[in-house]
């Protein structure tokens, strides 16, 4: 800790406790045991003509008392006994020595112990080019305007998502759009679950492969995300919960659950409700407003913040492996359609090789997700897509003009080969390598 100005003649702050004698010019400062009492006479000559210093302490000396004064110090208050020292202080690295170190000194001096157990330093919020924001540069992003445009939760989530390892944040508005889209995705998923309740008639209560997969992945997610929160790795926690909500829950499980819901499977509806409730809890520290609203609509409970934090359940490795094979089969079919220029909703027939048992055991889910049916025999001519566990073969006859498609592919191949040849010539040129 380096020396710092006692005062910078600011307009507001703690007034300096020094009195000047107008008779002998002595400086009177109360002793520590009487620092709350104003002196009535000069200690040197006894004159009552004392004038207090008109300046105030510098900001950082006043701020150094923040952990104490907010809890009622110097009085021995119940809050001071209960909440000092604090747990975590979150602040920018740029004021580590200006503020944090002075709070540490004040805490040790007045209370005998440091004011915080942990200090979490984050970076500065810069513009998209990495420059500090200033009115003169015209690059200031007004957070109130961002809240109005994207929502408070979106701004909060975007900043958390970007706050990696204390590094500065380059705040591009595209990140706020990402966070807003994520909030919309969550809202629509919750709306789907709530609407699925309406008029639901239970006809069976059997866990599906998708149910088992989602519960297992949720258990893993709870364990990993909780550990990240406890380690104060908030950016990685945001990334993990984003992937769990968007990809695993919305993109795969919600879609895979639709055939079971249509069949009246009560276990699937219950899984949807329970998984969504846990996801809202995991997201609540980052998106408190939306998650509270959705949780109340889902459970009827008003205070999500008072609910117990979720605990991880058991893992189902067999279900995860089987569902992964099913996902790869669906992904392969979708990729084949895209390569052939077919719309995603186009019904096709495919032949699968590899880990195909999960597809056969969950044929209705596969048909719904892939918009495809299975061929009993391997076709002689087909478009092929190989995945780590599944290979899909899709014959093109009857779907498009095969000869025309082949001509387009050959033309594209020639263009790519020509591009590769030009690139090789450039790389072989001494003049190009020297640049």
Q: Whereabouts are the PLM-identified features?
A:
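Cys/His-rich finger/ribbon microdomains and the adjacent scaffold used
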Residues: 1-84, 114, 118, 136, ...
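Core structural elements
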Residues: 4, 181-194, 211-221, 238-259, ...
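Acidic, turn-prone loop/beta-hairpin segments
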Residues: 40, 50, 127, 160, ...
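Secondary-structure transition/capping motifs at alpha-helix termini
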Residues: 41-51, 74-83, 106-118, 127-128, ...
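Glycine- and acidic
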Residues: 78-92, 139-144, 164-176, 202-210, ...
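Metal-dependent nuclease catalytic cores in nucleic-acid-processing enzymes
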Residues: 96-112, 330-337
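Catalytic adenosine-cofactor/nucleotide-binding cores of aminoacyl-tRNA synthetases and other
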Residues: 125-129, 133-207, 299-300, 339-351, ...
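C-terminal low-complexity, glycine/proline- and small-hydrophobic-enriched intrinsically disordered tails
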Residues: 177, 298-435
